[in-house]
């Protein structure tokens, strides 16, 4: 699911 990719990117911003 692409949603998981978005979560990884969000963690990168943190």
From Swiss-Prot:
UniProt subcellular location: Secreted, Cell wall
Key words of the record: Cell wall, Secreted
Secreted found in the keyword field: yes
GO CC annotation terms, alphabetical: extracellular region
Name listed for the protein in its UniProt record: 53 kDa cell wall protein
Main subcellular location of this protein, as a coarse class: secreted
């Amino acid at each position: 699911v692409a949603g998981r990719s978005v979560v990884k990117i969000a963690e990168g911003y943190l």
